[in-house]
């Protein structure tokens, strides 16, 4: 398990773009489970949407990528590196995410060739899938 202090030592992301609060399970270099506590204090809720706050789908995908990045960057050979999106495939949004929700995010590495990889990611709220897809990444 990693708390936010440990996550900050692994990921290069910082406020307001750090979108993972805790890693609750990890198999370094292979898979991870993390949590994002969604609060009304998130800066994006000011404009998305006033009176009807909904977490932007692209930020759910980014949160999924950050959980996956913790798993990959925990691997000794990738420590200190920066992960970049190389592509996003088969992403589907099933439900909206609102303030007060807790995103449970699961990511698992599908393939890794050198510094290019693909992971399957799923985000849940209260046991229901809100988003799923495949994330392609490059590590530099």
Curated annotation (Swiss-Prot):
Record-level GO cellular component terms: cytoplasm; membrane
Entry annotation: catalytic residues: 48
Domain of life: Bacteria
One Pfam family recorded for the sequence: FabA
Record flagged with keyword Lipid metabolism: yes
Location(s) in or outside the cell: Cytoplasm
Catalytic reaction(s) noted: a (3R)-hydroxyacyl-[ACP] = a (2E)-enoyl-[ACP] + H2O
Function: Involved in unsaturated fatty acids biosynthesis. Catalyzes the dehydration of short chain beta-hydroxyacyl-ACPs and long chain saturated and unsaturated beta-hydroxyacyl-ACPs.
Record-linked NCBIfam families: fabZ (TIGR01750), PRK00006.1 (NF000582)
Protein name: 3-hydroxyacyl-[acyl-carrier-protein] dehydratase FabZ
Name of the encoding gene: fabZ
């Amino acid at each position: 398990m990693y708390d936010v202090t440990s996550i900050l030592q692994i990921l290069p992301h910082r406020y307001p773009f750090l979108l993972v609060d805790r890693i609750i399970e990890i198999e370094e270099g292979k898979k991870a489970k993390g949590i994002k506590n969604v609060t009304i204090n998130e800066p994006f809720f000011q404009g998305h949407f006033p009176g009807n706050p909904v977490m932007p789908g692209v930020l759910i995908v980014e949160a999924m990528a950050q959980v996956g990045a913790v798993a990959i960057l925990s691997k000794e050979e990738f420590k200190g590196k920066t992960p970049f999106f190389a592509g996003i495939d088969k992403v589907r949004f099933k439900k909206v995410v609102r303030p007060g929700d807790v995103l449970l995010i699961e990511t698992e590495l599908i393939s890794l060739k050198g510094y290019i990889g693909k992971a399957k990611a799923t985000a849940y709220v209260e046991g229901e899938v809100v988003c799923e897809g495949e994330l392609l990444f490059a590590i530099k």
